[in-house]
Structure formats: structure tokens, C-alpha cells
């Protein structure tokens, strides 16, 4: 395990330059992290031996104080190795492999497939649903595995929507990313209403990676969508606004997938500020996820009622554009299941009784 973690200040760079590798490879030791935050060195080493840590210089600079919403997302915690509740793979991405489906593909829904093209990220989030494998050099996708996945997509004509995921696809060099993207595009563009999506946290944790060259390349493969991952208002900065603006100016619609995290964003005001900030930089709030029961992340989980409370605090109290779906990705591979507060009170052949955001009741008369 690489025990070096990147910690330093924010940087400006030329949009046409490739990202500086030093921004994501290590240059500060666990000794220094221990000293900065007053954390036991032996404990840090034990955590990082099991769950690798990586923090971009930029993201570290957003920490204002120990224990804040940025700190909790990126700094290793002893709670990770004390967790006895969770599962390594609660969504059954690997432990329930379907015969004939390549290891890099999850084909859970009829017309969609998830394609994991990287196992590296600019930052290893402490609550990651794939923390069992992200950052492990032995689990880096090979080109042979990628070819098998492409062949699967080609053979399954029902797939019209491919989500490139990881890890983080934007951690690949532009040339390799385009090579994979082009192969997927050649298949999907021939299918009715075919689209490609990319899931990435780069605009949030390493926005310097979004360059004009990258955006120019992505523009060649429309219709292309990006799902970002912002979890706290402090992540919305001039740098992340610039990165998202460049992607939006390239004609790429963006959605955001937030994870509900205890001590990070589990209150209505924080979540409302985040959702409004996202919309202001042309990113549509898409999902709020109930935190998955991943081994090593139980300390991040809230009660489901907390998510419903937050959803209810958004609906009617801010513009509809700012209200995402609240979902649980069902353990055991059941897929995303949306949850709603009790707006529908009763329903029969004659009428429907509804409750609005002010808890007032209204009747809707059914047609004969």
C-alpha cells in the first residue's frame, strides 16, 4: 500500500495543459498527517493498509477545521476498521456475477449498462461503495477486460445507455479515455436514442483536470452526459464552478449524485445550500443516495427518516430544479428505489387526498 498522501494548497493552471501528476500522487507522509491533525500514526497506517487514501492538494485546501464536512470525506478514520456491520459488496456488483457478463460490466437494468473503465480516483472517498477495490493496483482494468466489455455491449442490442464509471474515468489520460469512449460511441450511436454517461468526481475534488483539450475531445461524442458528485456546499468554489462551466459550455448536460452522510450534509440547510449552488453552476441535482451499508463506512450512515426529512424540506421550499430524487440503492442488487414523504394520503375511485409542503390537505376529484 502506498502510504503517501497528497496534501498541499490550491493551484491555478493553463486550461490547455494536462493535469500535473504531482497534484494526485503523494508528497506528504503519514508522519506529517499525524502531526497536522493530531492523529495516531499507527492507527493511520492500519487504516490505510486496508483502505488506501489519496487526497488532491486542491481538495485538502478546502478543509477549514478538523472534523468539518470536507475533512470527514477524505481523512482516514479509525471507525473504518472498527466497523463490523457493513458488507464489502452490498450491491452485489461482484459477489453475484452473472454468467456471461464481463467483470467490468454491471447490467442491472434492461437498457443500461455500467462499464468500469478505471479503478483510480483523484481522491479516495472514505464512504466509497467500491472501497474494497478502488486504488488497488492489482484490480486495474486490463485492455483485454475492456475489450470483453465492449464485445458484450456490442452483442446486447437492448443496451442504449452506457455509463462509464470506475474509479473515475477522468483519471485516465485523454488518449486512453478517448479510445474507450470512441469504441462505445461507435456502438451506441447506431442504436435508437443511444446515449453515453460519465460518472466522475473530478470537477469536485480535482477541477484542474478539466481542460479545454478534454472538453474539445468530449464534444465529439454527443449525446454525452456527466454525473458529478458534490456532497457539501464548501465544494462549490471558483475552481469547481470554472470546471463545470467548461463542461456545460461544451454542450454537456450535468447531473449531480449526492450521498447523504452523517456529520457532512445531514441537515436541511446544508443540503438546500448545496442544491441551490449546483443549479447556479448549471448542474442539475439528480439523486440523493442513502449511504450504502459498505464495510468501513457505517459511521456515515443516517436513519432513512433523515433523508425523507431533508427531501421534504426541499420540496416547496426551493425551486423544483433544486430537488433531486431520494433513493436507496437496494442491498443485494435490487437497484435504485425512490422514497417520498407521505404526500398521497388516500386514493379511491372518487377522489385523491393530497398533502402539500405546508402539510395542508387538498382533494383531487377522479374522472368518471
Task: Place the predicted regions along the sequence by residue.
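C-terminal accessory regions of radical SAM enzymes
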Residues: 309-368
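Residues that line or immediately flank small-molecule/substrate-binding pockets and catalytic motifs
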Residues: 132, 166, 290
